[in-house]
Amino acid sequence: MARPPVVGVFTERKPMRAWDAPASVTLPGQAALPRIFDTAAGEIVQVQEDKAASLYVCGITPYDATHMGHASTYVAFDLLHRAWLDAGVPVTYVQNVTDVDDPLLERATATNVDWRELAEDQTELFRTDMKALNVIPPAHYVGVVESIEWLFPLIEDLFRRGLAYRVPGFTDEQGVVHPDGDVYLDLKAVRELPANAEGYSWAPGEVCHLTRDEMLEIFAERGGDPNRAGKRDALDPLLWRVEREGEPSWDAGELGAGRPGWHIECTMIARRFVDGSLTVQAGGNDLTFPHHDLGAGHSWAVSARPHAKHYAHTGMVGLDGHKMSKSRGNLVLVSRLRAAGEDANAVRLAIMGQHYRSDWFWTDELLEHAKARLDTYRHAVSVAEGREGSEGVTDEAAVELLTTVREALGEDLNAPAALAAVDAWAVKALADTTVGGGALVRDILAARLGVVL
């Protein structure tokens, strides 16, 4: 049954809370600033932020539980967060929650659940998964619903400057009536804006490096509407969707009742909590286009500066030969693994056994290997700790391990290399009675790899 429109919902929502942070562990010395692969640059670059850094990782649309693809992304950029902290760099971490969107509304209707309840239930499940995986929470965890009113002046300003336009309504082939007034960003007008004082101006493709034909194909696959009647350019993204019967909507004054488009939401939240360009905009590589590429255009139109200095993306995680996705239903859920008694530290180790930019497939064998690895680490650290104070015992191997782990994670978050170094230390610790430093290794695992023994 269609649900009635809900106007002004944001006034009913409290600010979204994140999850509890894992215990903070400080290591001796200090790491170098990390280098990461910048998708826009097409190479590994030095992240030049020695005073403060900002990180925006696109959040979930909460209509289903956290699957391994989600977990892989948030664990990967948790490693970046930890790399900065170990280098003495404070981090402003922002993450959104798309708690009103078409997939969420469709799932709520299909299951006869109020969309707000569905969003809150799945967001809470996500929080518990992230806490179990020892992911450092964002300083600003922001739902779209709670922040919709911040969008109104942004879109109105784009209108005043001739960068946004309305399209007429129409009836589609299925007989669905689309009313007058949807608002789109005019990409041609945005491209024609003059360069800023630093010489920067935005153009489509600066993040994704795709041809226009490739963009058009992907745009349709990832939530875009290239064939929408009345658009000036097929790639023009939606800014404001005017009210439809049965959908939630918000009274936006001159814009009319409706709800926001996807890309402008992240632009708005990033601008709200970070002064200037983000240090790193991150997410799965399925967000490279259209979300991050066109999102950069939104930021340029709104603020006359680059959205981010760097873009970083994780590879896709699959199961049974296909990308893991909610729509396909081939999901390995973190919550189900936890409910089955699996240690979330082992799940995290299984994820970090793959390089974050690689596409990979989840298997039971990966988890079994990670569980054995975790058992070995716990045993080796315990044995090494038990030797402390004994004659001839030294922590030299642990100190060398700290250097190796820092170097591996500092070079494009190479967690597999870091774990291989811990493996080698564990073998040595179990074979050589002079190897100590167990407490330091415990701290290395907690502080840099997010693994708690």
From Swiss-Prot:
Q: Please give one Pfam family short name.
A: tRNA-synt_1e
Where Zn(2+) binds, per the record, is at C58, C266, H291
- What positions carry the motif 'ERGGDP' region? 221-226
One biological process term from GO is: cysteinyl-tRNA aminoacylation
Q: What cofactors does this protein use?
A: Zn(2+)
Q: Give the transmembrane region(s).
A: none
The record lists L-cysteinyl-5'-AMP as bound by: C58, G59, I60, T61, T73, N96, V97, T98, W262, G284, N285, D286, V317
Q: Please tell me which stretches of this chain the record labels as motif 'KMSKS' region.
A: 323-327
The entry's free-text remark on the cofactor is:
Binds 1 zinc ion per subunit.
| Record GO cellular component, one term | cytosol
Per the Swiss-Prot or TrEMBL annotation, the motif 'HIGH' region is positioned at: 60-70
**So what EC number does this one have?**
6.3.1.13
Q: Which reaction does it catalyse?
A: 1D-myo-inositol 2-amino-2-deoxy-alpha-D-glucopyranoside + L-cysteine + ATP = 1D-myo-inositol 2-(L-cysteinylamino)-2-deoxy-alpha-D-glucopyranoside + AMP + diphosphate + H(+)
What are the protein's UniProt keywords?
ATP-binding, Ligase, Metal-binding, Nucleotide-binding, Zinc
The record's similarity note reads: Belongs to the class-I aminoacyl-tRNA synthetase family. MshC subfamily.
Described function: Catalyzes the ATP-dependent condensation of GlcN-Ins and L-cysteine to form L-Cys-GlcN-Ins.
Q: Per its record, how is this protein called by name?
A: L-cysteine:1D-myo-inositol 2-amino-2-deoxy-alpha-D-glucopyranoside ligase
The record lists the organism as Rothia mucilaginosa (strain DY-18) (Stomatococcus mucilaginosus)
The organism's taxonomic lineage, starting at the top: Bacteria, Bacillati, Actinomycetota, Actinomycetes, Micrococcales
